[in-house]
Amino acid sequence: MVNLKIKKIDDAAILPECAHEGDAGLDLFSVEEKVIKAGESALIGTGIQMELPPETEAQVRPRSGLALKHSITVLNSPGTIDEGYRGEVKIILINHGKEDFKVEKSMKIAQMVIKPVLKVKVEEVKELSSSDRGTGGFGSTGLKK
């Protein structure tokens, strides 16, 4: 287990937490109230800053309950928070529903999963090795068996 260092920058901030032992995602909480109109998006503050463990990233993902019950999701999903970022963690939520949605203080608005990052060196080549798939993509495997 590694430590995730969190700094509260708002009195209303709640530390990220897993709802159940073994959960991959840490719930992120709103520190503000804001209405997201139907079809629109909004940037919601969490009131926290963090220091990620070395060679990791945080992926911000939607909460399934908000998506199913209210059509609220994370716009750039998954959102990536890089290891070196030290600003406030903010979440871009979008309302895909037909009614306005009110984000309330202390509401669980997203989840965050900490993932290892593989460091790569970009190498330009003239040719790539062949594969069974080749250049097939965008539906090339069909919809049915």
Swiss-Prot record:
Q: What's its EC?
A: 3.6.1.23
Query: InterPro entries in the record, alphabetically?
Result: dUTPase (IPR008181), dUTPase-like (IPR029054), dUTPase-like_sf (IPR036157), dUTPase_trimeric (IPR033704)
Highest taxon of the source?
Bacteria
CDD domains referenced in this protein's UniProt entry, alphabetically: trimeric_dUTPase
- Reactions the enzyme catalyzes: dUTP + H2O = dUMP + diphosphate + H(+)
> Part of which pathway?
Pyrimidine metabolism; dUMP biosynthesis; dUMP from dCTP (dUTP route): step 2/2
Q: Which UniProt keywords apply?
A: Hydrolase, Magnesium, Metal-binding, Nucleotide metabolism
Amino-acid positions noted as binding substrate in the UniProt annotation, renumbered to this chain = 63-65, 76, 80-82, 90
Single Gene Ontology BP term? dUMP biosynthetic process
The protein's required cofactor(s) are namely: Mg(2+)
GO MF term list: dUTP diphosphatase activity; magnesium ion binding
- Could you tell me which PANTHER family the record lists for this protein? DEOXYURIDINE 5'-TRIPHOSPHATE NUCLEOTIDOHYDROLASE
Biological role: This enzyme is involved in nucleotide metabolism: it produces dUMP, the immediate precursor of thymidine nucleotides and it decreases the intracellular concentration of dUTP so that uracil cannot be incorporated into DNA.
NCBIfam families annotated for this entry?
dut, PRK00601.1
Q: Which family does it belong to?
A: Belongs to the dUTPase family.
Protein name from the UniProt record: Deoxyuridine 5'-triphosphate nucleotidohydrolase
Tell me what organism the protein belongs to. Answer: Clostridium acetobutylicum (strain ATCC 824 / DSM 792 / JCM 1419 / IAM 19013 / LMG 5710 / NBRC 13948 / NRRL B-527 / VKM B-1787 / 2291 / W)
Q: Which gene encodes it?
A: dut
